[in-house]
Amino acid sequence: MLLLRRLNRVRIASPYSVRLLSVKPISNVDDAKFRSQEEEDQSSYDQKTVCEALTCYSNDWQKALEFFNWVERESGFRHTTETFNRVIDILGKYFEFEISWALINRMIGNTESVPNHVTFRIVFKRYVTAHLVQEAIDAYDKLDDFNLRDETSFYNLVDALCEHKHVVEAEELCFGKNVIGNGFSVSNTKIHNLILRGWSKLGWWGKCKEYWKKMDTEGVTKDLFSYSIYMDIMCKSGKPWKAVKLYKEMKSRRMKLDVVAYNTVIRAIGASQGVEFGIRVFREMRERGCEPNVATHNTIIKLLCEDGRMRDAYRMLDEMPKRGCQPDSITYMCLFSRLEKPSEILSLFGRMIRSGVRPKMDTYVMLMRKFERWGFLQPVLYVWKTMKESGDTPDSAAYNAVIDALIQKGMLDMAREYEEEMIERGLSPRRRPELVEKSLDETLVCRE
C-alpha cells in the first residue's frame, strides 16, 4: 500500500514516543519532485484507505499509533470517528487504555470525530476482554459526559460481558441487587437473548436449557433471535436434531426466518441429516425471498467438504460471485482444511490473493502449520513472505508456526532470529529446548 510505503520514510525516536521525523531529500530537484508527488498522493488519503492501513498494524499498537499520527501530521488528513475507533480498538487490544482515553478526549469538540456508540462498545469490549469488568462498568457511568448513557450503550455493555464469558456479572448487572439505575426497563426480550447467548459462550448447556425454560416461566416473549440462539446452542451441544425440531416449531408458528436463522438451520440439518438436506433448505430460503449471504455459502461449502465432495465445493465457490456474494477468508479456510496436496493448497491460496480476498492471520497460521506437519519448509516461508508483503503484522501464533518449521529442518540460527524479532516486538515466544541449548553452547564457546 502507498501509505505503508510512505510511512517507511519516518522513524520513532523511542519506544514510547510517537513523534514523527521526516527524511529530507538531498537535492532541490528531488525535493520538488517529492513535494509534487506528495501533493498528488494526498488525494488518496481517504477514510477507507487509512482504516485499511491501520488494520495492517492490528498486531503492533506502536506502529498503528505511529501511523495514525503520521498520516495526520504529514498529509493534513483529518481523522474521522471511524479512524479514531479503529486505532482505539488496536490500543485496547494491548491494554493501552490510558492512551485510548486520551484519544477519546481528543475526539470531543470535532464534528468529524465525535465519540459514538461504537467508540464505547469498543471500550467495553476491550476492558471485558482484559477481565476488567468494573472498569467497563465505570466507563458506562462516564457516558453522561458524552450524552451516550442510554439504552443502546447499556445493551453494548451487557453484550460485551456476555460475549467474553462474564455472563454472571451481566446477569447481576441486569437483575441482581446492584442494578444500575438507567431509567429504562431491562426485563425485555433483547436482554434475555444476550444473556442466553452468554451462557452459550461459556458452553454451559444445562444452564442454557434452564434459562430457556426460565424465559417461559417469567413470560418473556421469545422472538426470532431467541430461537436462532437456542438452535445454535443445540447444534454446538451435539444435538442438531433438536435444532431441526425448533425449526419446525418456528414454521408452525409462521415465524418469518431471516438469513441468520436459516444459516443455523442449514448447519443443523446438514449435520443431522446430511448435506443434501442442507442444500434443500438453501433452495427453500431463496424461494421464500431470503437471499443467502457469505455465511450461508460458507456453511454449504463446509458441509460439502466434510462429505468429501470437493468438486461441488469448488463449484459453489465459482458460483458465489455470480450471485453477488463475494467469498471471504472463511470460505477459503473451509476448503484449505480439507485439501491434502501442497500444490492444490498453494494454487487455491494464489487464487485467493489474486481475487482480492485478504487472508486473516488465522489463515496464514493454518497454512503454515499444515505445511509444517507435512515437513515442507519452502511453502511455509512463501506464506510468511506473502503475509509480510500484504502489510500484515504477524502475531505470536504466526511467529511460533514459522519458528517450529525452521527447527524441524534444523535451521536453528534462522529460528533464533525470528525468536529475537518476536521479543523485540514485545511478544513472548514459547520455551524451546533446541534454542535454549544452542544459546548455552554459544555462551560456553565464548567463555573458552
UniProtKB/Swiss-Prot annotation:
The organism's superkingdom is given as Eukaryota
Q: Which PANTHER family match?
A: OS10G0422300 PROTEIN, RESPIRATORY COMPLEX I CHAPERONE (CIA84), PUTATIVE (AFU_ORTHOLOGUE AFUA_2G06020)-RELATED
Q: Could you confirm whether the keyword Repeat appears in this record? A: yes
Q: Where would you say this protein principally sits, based on its record?
A: mitochondrion
Where in or outside the cell? Mitochondrion
Q: Where are the PPR repeats?
A: 80-110, 116-146, 150-186, 188-222, 223-257, 258-292, 293-327, 331-359, 360-394, 395-429
Q: Where is the transit peptide?
A: 1-21
Q: Pfam families per the record? A: PPR, PPR_2
Question: In the UniProt record, does the keyword Repeat occur?
Answer: yes
Descriptive protein name:
Pentatricopeptide repeat-containing protein At1g80550, mitochondrial
Matches recorded under InterPro entries? Pentatricopeptide_rpt, TPR-like_helical_dom_sf
Q: Which terms in the GO cellular component ontology are assigned? A: mitochondrion
